[in-house]
């Protein structure tokens, strides 16, 4: 062991007594992949971290105490690497390199690295665990490192039925606790929370230490503490867990539980070995009782097995090949049936025979009896020799079957490949000879010939591409012959037919190319003429079609200028007809030249010109149609010209009248507006003047009737515009109606003003003053004032409606009187009504009551005598008949209530 006293005087260790840990050989790759589920990318759950700290600390101290030391804080006490190296020496029983002296960080890192290198030398992959993290006291990395050490030196070698360490430990726990009620170990976390599993493990091996039947599942803390205390006191297993932590954690830390449970496994391993030995003795004793029976069974089994081997070997050595894969597959199926059905029982018999023989010999030897000697030829070695001969024959037979099947599969694959390629080739060549022999070029046009040549070139490319397939077909046929394919004759026949046909296609291809090229040259001259004809015929045909469309086009004109423009364009078109006729003759001459060349060279032209569908017949037919349409167009244009001249006369006639009536209406409207604003003279004079003006307007009505008649003629002629006037009939009608409405409204306003003046007692001067003020602020002369204009008018008349709170309130009150509908406008009539109320006596109930009070001598009632004395007789009797008796405290006989009578007159109460 390393001398730690020299490295650090703060640690006083005694002589080393390295424990026999779980260290040893063996690869850690698969083990670590299954067991080390430490997740270094995630933070530990606080509860789990707490459990791990306690458990791992206790586990480390259980080994460090063998060296006379211990740790208190797991992430602090390993920082210098000294106790970490000591822990590894104790649990491995090996010596580590000497630690470095000094307490500097570099010394600590080097010591930790020595420990980590030692762990890595045991086949452990330390992923993301570095010496710096351990020296820095990284709790997560330190716990991860200790867990890795626990896995390697405490759990790795636990194996039950070839399971991994974790699974083996779990299986061991399940088997040991299986007989116990309320215990079902399925994992290393929640299965241990109630403590019964810990107690069951102890009771299974040391029943005298635990009274299991007295434990209750609903008291987990007591159960856990009982198990921990018994384990610490009697089994020398330190207390690594807290009962409260386990119970209060939804899922206890799996690593902490595994570490603690592994201590039980190592503590009870000796007892388990004793149990195994006892079972072995029982089995030996049981076998000893059956020795004689086994001897008889051996003899019979050996005879039967040897006989079966002697019968089977000749069948396996039969290597006669078959012709088809189906036959070989049947032999393979028979062999598989032998392996599946016949041989397994014999393997079992042989195995049982050897087991019985070995068991029998062992039992006899242990019981000091002479060894069993089978009959001659029936020794185990004889059976093994026969079995080896059988397996050798079997192995060779299987190899032969597979080779034969592979050979036949190869042959079948090649044959199928040959058939597929041959079928594809034959399908491709089908009809190719007939195509190459076809003399379709003899009646083809030049474009057809060129298309046939391009098609033939494509075929030649396709033919060259298929050369590889023909060569592949021949190569496959050759390989089938070399492999002795059973149907080689048919393959060779088919291959020869394909090759002969291929040679014939090559010869026909060459002949057809020569014929196509010869025909192409003969047709090029004619084609050039056809092309020239098409180039000139197409635009000429388009010109004729456009001309016919234009000549037949329905024209819609509305002015004389438009029809004159159409006539001018038509005259210009007629001037181009001689040139067009010359072009027509030239085009027809080209066609005749092509016909002459074809006839002189005995060429049979198939169909019409390939470049155009415009034939000479079409050109002549359309030319004749153009000649017929020209005079028709002349006649139609002249008729339309006459019509437009008549329409122009109607326009001018209407315009001359409308240009008089329209301004007259506009002038009258302006004069009425001026009269309504100026209002010179008395209201009666103004009313008389306006009525005379109205009669003059009505007298003008015949002029509108005449205009209506002219408008009717325009509508019948479908004339929609008139550039000679800006006035439409609708415009005239609307203006006339507005004129009549305006003069009537103005007369009505004057009449209302007269009524207001007479009712309110307004003088003529006041009325003119009101009109002057209103007109002054009516800037747009619209006959109404807006709110701001009305406010300015009121201010000019002395009203206090300034922009303060009191002025705004007064203005709003006045606006509610003059504009009750809230239209935002104040008419002159509303303005007059308001001003008359403000400047004349108010005819109200209060005023009448005050008058009656004067007649009554300031009393609250009046008598009949007073009424008859002050009022005319009829009015006095009217009041006496309708006045109610006065009911006040100061009433006298015959007193009448003049107040209720006055309010009733104005509808403020009932009579």
From Swiss-Prot:
- UniProt motif LXXLL motif: location: 84-88
InterPro entries in the cross-refs? Actinin_actin-bd_CS, CH_dom, CH_dom_sf, EF-hand-dom_pair, EF-hand_Ca_insen, EF_Hand_1_Ca_BS, EF_hand_dom, Spectrin/alpha-actinin
* Compartments where located: Nucleus; Cytoplasm; Cell junction; Cytoplasm, Cytoskeleton, Stress fiber
Phosphoserine modification sites are 696, 909
GO CC annotations on file: anchoring junction; cytoplasm; nucleus; perinuclear region of cytoplasm; ribonucleoprotein complex; stress fiber
Query: Where in the sequence is Phosphotyrosine found?
Result: 31
Q: Which UniProt keywords are present, listed alphabetically?
A: Acetylation, Actin-binding, Calcium, Cell junction, Cytoplasm, Cytoskeleton, Metal-binding, Nucleus, Phosphoprotein, Protein transport, Repeat, Transport
- Record region (Actin-binding): 1-269
RNA-binding is among the record's keywords: no
EF-hand domain sequence ranges: 765-800, 806-841
List N6-acetyllysine occurrences by residue.
114, 214, 592, 625, 779, 859
The answer on whether this UniProt entry bears the keyword Kinase reads no
Residue spans of the Spectrin repeats: 293-403, 413-518, 528-639, 649-752
One term of GO molecular function: calcium ion binding
- In this chain the Calponin-homology (CH) domain maps to 50-154, 163-269
- Annotated region Mediates interaction with MICALL2: where? 736-911
Q: What does this protein do?
A: F-actin cross-linking protein which is thought to anchor actin to a variety of intracellular structures. This is a bundling protein. Probably involved in vesicular trafficking via its association with the CART complex. The CART complex is necessary for efficient transferrin receptor recycling but not for EGFR degradation. Involved in tight junction assembly in epithelial cells probably through interaction with MICALL2. Links MICALL2 to the actin cytoskeleton and recruits it to the tight junctions.
Record family assignment = Belongs to the alpha-actinin family.
Tell me how this protein assembles.
Answer: Homodimer; antiparallel. Identified in a IGF2BP1-dependent mRNP granule complex containing untranslated mRNAs. Component of the CART complex, at least composed of ACTN4, HGS/HRS, MYO5B and TRIM3. Binds TRIM3 at the N-terminus. Interacts with MAGI1. Interacts with PDLIM2. Identified in a complex with CASK, IQGAP1, MAGI2, NPHS1, SPTAN1 and SPTBN1. Interacts with MICALL2 (preferentially in opened conformation); stimulated by RAB13 activation. Interacts with PPARG and RARA. Binds to VCL; this interaction triggers VCL conformational changes. Interacts with SEPTIN14. Interacts with IGSF8.
**Record note on domains:** Contains one Leu-Xaa-Xaa-Leu-Leu (LXXLL) motif that mediates interaction with nuclear receptors.
- The protein's name: Alpha-actinin-4
Q: Which organism is it from?
A: Pongo abelii (Sumatran orangutan)
Q: Which gene encodes it?
A: ACTN4
